[in-house]
Amino acid sequence: MNVAGYISLLVILSLLIGYLFGSIMFADVASMILKRNVRELGSKNPGTTNSFRVFPKKVAIAIGFFEIIKSVIPFSIILLIYKYGLQPELTKLDPSVINKTYYLTYLAPLAAIFGHMYPVYFKFNGGKAVATTAGFVFVVSPWWFLIIALTWWTITLISKYVSLASIVCFIIFLFLPYIPWLDYLWWFSLDKITFLTYQSDWYIIVFFAIANTILSTIIIWKHRGNIVRLINKQENKITKKV
């Protein structure tokens, strides 16, 4: 197989594994087990926030955890496939191609996010993917994760509006790729502190800029109902149970 073949294989595996894993809706799984349909109660959204309204707290926490790691797990699988399967073969063919392809492993968590929003197992009717995107943020950069996590928790604790915290975070998320010293792809740089630069890594910055723009646009659009309710002061707080 040539270089193009291995790169195509990496892209296909990343998209396929990420999407299929992301399509697992843990709130729906809990609904089946507990006989309490998350899609018919509260905001009717099969996500983490509504799970706190519908299910016992421990169950909701578990759902939130699994929603986060369901973008981390496919990335980890693809990372192992890349490092121990594809990278050695690519190195034999053209060592210079490694620095131009490794970031494609991040297609896996991106596909997981779209799997959550449009799950094949649930007729493409999914959630808003806030928690699943948090997993993507975590595997991209600890600095991204720290900024987003602190912002989200601060706004949520003060306002009690998870939707408001999420919307603000995705506005910030939109601009993070344009600050290169925050783009620390730590899974590939565990031995030293490093970051991307416009001079040598511009195509990776463009990759994440496009990805973040698409995600922010779609997820904020999915919150359009929340925005209207926030403006009209009709939005439910996280503390409200059903």
UniProtKB/Swiss-Prot annotation:
Disulfide bonds: none
Listed HAMAP family: PlsY (MF_01043)
A GO CC term attached to the entry: plasma membrane
Role of this protein: Catalyzes the transfer of an acyl group from acyl-phosphate (acyl-PO(4)) to glycerol-3-phosphate (G3P) to form lysophosphatidic acid (LPA). This enzyme utilizes acyl-phosphate as fatty acyl donor, but not acyl-CoA or acyl-ACP.
Subunit composition and interactions: Probably interacts with PlsX.
Species the sequence originates in: Mycoplasmoides gallisepticum (strain R(low / passage 15 / clone 2))
The name this protein goes by in its record: Glycerol-3-phosphate acyltransferase
GO MF annotation list: acyl-phosphate glycerol-3-phosphate acyltransferase activity
Pathway as given in its UniProt record: Lipid metabolism; phospholipid metabolism
Swiss-Prot/TrEMBL keywords: Cell membrane, Lipid biosynthesis, Lipid metabolism, Membrane, Phospholipid biosynthesis, Phospholipid metabolism, Transferase, Transmembrane, Transmembrane helix
Main location: membrane
Signal peptide coordinates: none
GO biological process, one term: phospholipid biosynthetic process
Regions that span the bilayer: 7-27, 61-81, 102-122, 135-155, 162-182, 201-221
EC number: 2.3.1.275
